[in-house]
Design a protein with these regions (language model features):
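FAD-dependent oxidoreductase catalytic-site/capping-region signature
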Residues: 1-137, 145-155
């Protein structure tokens, strides 16, 4: 079984580590930084466990490998889930749009705060992830941004 939390509250970060652009940044996914997300992972795990135990499926499903049937407390389950957790979302929100440069990267017209002539036009400006594929939202962001760029160029 596989499942993903579509509305996580945890927020990661990307930090510049050197003035040289060739030096990789520090990426902290912080996947379970918020207790709410850990609780949702536990709920999903327990749901999968109950589905696997359903009489119609039980004959076709082998023994639970991780964390094992003996693990029944949050303290026993969470460390095992942490070994398997990964981000299932397309990356969004790394350059969030907003009005305040202290907690956002771009303004409402996709312009990077404090840097003239630079815009970001992709899903990284979306402050929260969408509950689905990002292709459509990416095209919508690009379409609207193109219109704004043309408006700004015309004066």
């Amino acid at each position: 079984f596989s499942g993903y939390h579509l509305r996580p509250r945890s927020r990661g970060s990307v930090t510049v580590t050197a003035p040289d652009y060739k030096t990789a940044p520090l990426v902290d996914m912080n996947i379970w930084g918020d207790d709410y997300d850990r609780q949702k992972a536990l709920e999903l795990f327990r749901l999968f466990r109950s589905i696997a135990a359903a009489p119609a499926l039980a004959p076709y499903i082998g023994a639970e490998r991780m964390p094992g049937a003996q693990a029944d407390s949050d303290a026993a389950i969470l460390p095992e889930l942490a070994k398997m957790v990964e981000a299932g979302l397309h990356g969004t929100g790394t350059c969030s749009m907003g009005t305040d440069a202290k907690d956002s990267v771009t303004d409402a017209r996709t312009r990077v705060h404090g840097i003239d002539g630079l815009r970001i036009v992709d899903c990284s400006i979306m402050p929260t992830p969408v509950s689905g594929n990002t292709n459509g939202p990416a095209m919508a962001v690009a379409h609207v941004a193109a219109e704004m760029i043309l408006e700004d160029a015309r004066g």
